[in-house]
Regions:
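SAM/dcSAM-binding transferase cores
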Residues: 150-194
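Mobile active-site "lid"/loop adjacent to the S-adenosyl-L-methionine
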Residues: 70-99
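Conserved SAM/SAH cofactor-binding pocket of Class I
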Residues: 1-79, 102
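Short, solvent-exposed coil/turn elements at secondary-structure transition points
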Residues: 54, 143-146, 161
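Conserved Class I SAM-dependent methyltransferase catalytic core
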Residues: 94-151
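Phosphate/oxyanion-binding loops and surfaces in catalytic or ligand/nucleic-acid-binding neighborhoods
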Residues: 73, 133, 161
Length: 194
């Protein structure tokens, strides 16, 4: 995982998928500390690295899968004064979309998959960043908080060296009409597993 933050995605992947090797890369020391604590608290076998994701190829190469939840917002857009660590998670202060895609491509094997969450409104930017870094967008899923709402996020799957051809998956709705998680989200987060 590139830009692992406090490790939520890595923890979920480790518990649900049990990969042979899982490496979580995070640049911010304060977030890296949370990541390490999360891994230890959950008793998981996740390698953690405090480094810039652009240097990830020094720790990983030939990866089958890379996941990334990069900063969504352009530099100096919105939110006024917030903690620097939070600002770096939300805004392209330390890395932009093209840099994140380049980092993913540098560690993926040919035909490896890159999963990325980003703003739905930046679909064109995502497609351009992926293609510029030798990856082709293969699947996309719009994410809505509630059914009937306009999607704000999207989940993308790209393949390094993949051929042209995008498949749209059904929308992912996070909350049901009562405000609880939908069965799909509960399954994704392994909420009903013992």
């Amino acid at each position: 995982e590139l830009g692992a933050g406090c490790g939520v995605i890595s923890v979920l992947i480790s518990k649900k998928q049990r990969p042979a090797r899982l490496v979580a890369v995070e640049i911010q020391p304060v977030m890296y500390d949370l990541l390490e604590r999360n891994v230890k608290l959950n008793g998981l076998d996740i390698e953690t690295v405090c480094a810039d994701m652009r240097d990830a190829e020094n720790f990983v190469n030939g990866a089958d899968i890379v996941v990334c939840n990069p900063p969504y917002r352009a530099l100096n857009s919105g939110e006024g004064q917030i903690k620097e660590s939070i600002k770096n998670c939300r805004h392209e202060t330390l890395i932009d979309l093209f840099g994140a895609a380049g980092a993913a491509s540098s560690v993926l094997r040919f035909n490896g998959s890159f999963f990325l969450v980003h703003q739905a409104e930046r679909f064109a930017d995502v497609a351009c960043a992926l293609r510029a870094n030798g990856m082709e967008l293969k699947e996309a899923c719009l994410i809505k908080s509630f059914s009937g709402q306009v999607p704000k996020l999207a989940l993308f799957k790209a393949v390094k060296g993949g051929k042209v051809g995008l498949k749209w998956l059904p929308d992912l709705v996070v909350f049901d009409e009562n405000g609880g998680y939908t069965p799909t989200v509960r399954r994704l987060y392994a909420m009903d597993e013992q």
